[in-house]
Regions:
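Sec-dependent N-terminal signal peptides
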Residues: 4-12
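C-terminal motif of bacterial Sec signal peptides marking the signal peptidase cleavage site
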Residues: 15-16
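Short, conserved catalytic-motif segment at the N-terminal edge
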Residues: 25-83, 103, 122-128, 398
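Active-site SXXK
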Residues: 36, 56, 82-110, 199-207, ...
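Acidic helix-start/capping segments at beta-turn-to-alpha-helix junctions
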Residues: 53-54, 109-121, 310-312
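Short, surface-exposed loop or secondary-structure junction motifs
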Residues: 120-359
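Short, surface-exposed beta-strand/loop micro-motifs that present aromatic residues
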Residues: 366, 373-386
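C-terminal soluble interaction/assembly domains
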Residues: 389-390
Length: 418
């Protein structure tokens, strides 16, 4: 471990003393650079960008491929991608700031902050005539249960009842533009783990308590203090030329997706800001968030969270509740996804925790998560290392994307161990 830390620090010196061009960043971790380049040269991915850093900042970044389907614009390290559910970590941090200020309590039912949820129901299934079987919920989820995805809210991509409910009009689809937040629970709060729209409700609570729109709260309390200049809900027109086309893998070919493409929007123009997704960012910007967590909540003199709060994020917050792979019911949106990669895992506050680490990679109780368009991150407090990998492909948990992520991770830790 000491050798690993020494190498990381020496890598930082190499990066810090050189110029900031792509060649310097690639030289810092040549094995990682090779992983990204190979994924592109072999045609597995159309675009890839990645970064690795530690407590001192970004040590390495690299991009390859093209940011457009026509392959006219070469990829760059500062390309802006849709990070989708990587938004959830930002929302969790924002909510934990309110906990520290004493205006939000982790173990209080969310009805204290959103009274209209006082009559929640649980969708038990459907009868023979396809009528929904809805039962009154025993209680509302707590704020902690929203952060840990034990609140009972799910996604229609991985839950058959939720998918059927949206098809029959019992609830709105996430893609409909309607009131998808009104969906019933899939199970009683605190009884199971399933990934879902829990963090979307957390965003609503932040807005209710702060009196600000979520985008404004993030700008003032997270993006501004961390000097994140390329993270936003509305993509500015002047930054469109750094955005990346979303592709779909169909019959082993990558084609341009007809929807969900990046589009410019005026700042403050969105009707709804989701705590569960919707942000654009770069690997450099998002790395600032992970670097802050490695520094126990502080970065460049700005304190975003107290050390004790950061500690709580990386502790098991779900007890004996077991995580399970997300079995797909919408294969065009997501493959079956095992975010533990076959290793023991639990859940902290806003983070999946690898309770025993990954052999040859991230250490025990490292945190991680991902975004729908196949962007992934990990933050390893033991090794003081973070990693980010991103492409823009559907469906989620794309085999080539996950393979590249894991090879990247192995390359980073292999080099640090030598």
């Amino acid at each position: 471990m000491k050798k690993a830390i020494i190498l990381i620090l020496s890598t930082a010196l190499i990066y810090g003393c050189g110029s900031s061009n792509d060649a310097d960043r690639q030289d810092a971790l040549p094995l990682a650079t090779e992983v990204i380049d190979t994924a592109i040269s072999e045609g597995e991915l159309h675009f890839a960008v990645a970064a690795v850093g530690n407590t001192t900042g970004q040590l390495w970044s690299h991009s390859a491929g093209h940011r457009d389907a026509q392959k006219t614009s070469v990829a760059a390290d500062d390309n802006i991608i849709q990070i989708a559910s990587m938004t959830k970590l930002i929302t969790t941090i924002g909510a934990l700031q309110l906990v520290e200020r004493g205006v939000l309590d982790l173990d209080t039912p969310i009805t204290a902050y959103v009274p209209q949820l006082s009559e929640l129901r649980v969708l038990e299934g459907f009868d023979e005539q396809d009528n929904p079987i809805l039962e009154n919920a025993n209680r509302a989820p707590t704020v902690r249960e929203l952060m840990t995805h034990t609140g009972g809210y799910v996604y229609e991509f991985w839950n058959a009842n939720a998918k059927k409910a949206s098809e029959l009009g019992v609830s709105e689809s996430l893609f409909s533009g309607g009131n998808y937040l009104a969906a019933p629970l899939a199970f009683e709060a605190g009884t199971a783990w399933e990934y879902g729209i829990n963090t979307d409700w957390l965003g609503v609570i932040i807005e209710r308590i702060s009196g600000q729109r979520l985008s404004v709260y993030f700008d003032e309390n997270i993006f501004g203090p961390l000097r994140m200049v390329d993270t936003f809900y509305e993509l500015p027109q002047e930054k469109m030329n750094r955005s990346v086309t979303v592709m779909a893998r169909v019959n082993d070919a990558l084609i341009e997706l007809p929807t969900l493409q990046p589009a410019p929007m005026a700042k403050g123009s969105m009707a709804h800001y989701s705590g569960g997704g919707g942000l654009y960012s770069t690997v450099a910007d998002y790395g600032r968030v992970l670097q802050m967590l490695l520094n126990d909540g502080v970065l460049d003199g700005e304190t975003l969270l107290n050390p004790e709060t950061v500690d709580s994020m990386f502790k098991n917050n779900i007890g004996d509740i077991q995580l399970a792979a997300l079995g797909t019911v919408m294969p065009e949106v997501s493959n079956t996804a095992d975010m533990s990669f076959g290793n023991p895992a639990t859940f902290g506050l806003g983070l999946l925790l690898h309770s025993e680490g990954i052999e040859g990679g991230r250490k025990a109780y490292s945190g991680s998560w991902a975004g729908l368009f196949n962007s992934y991150y990990w933050v390893d407090r033991e090794s003081k290392t973070y990693g980010i990998f991103g492409t823009q492909i559907l469906p989620f948990f794309d085999a080539a994307s996950v393979d590249t992520l894991l090879k990247l991770e192995q390359a980073v830790y292999a080099q640090n161990a030598n």
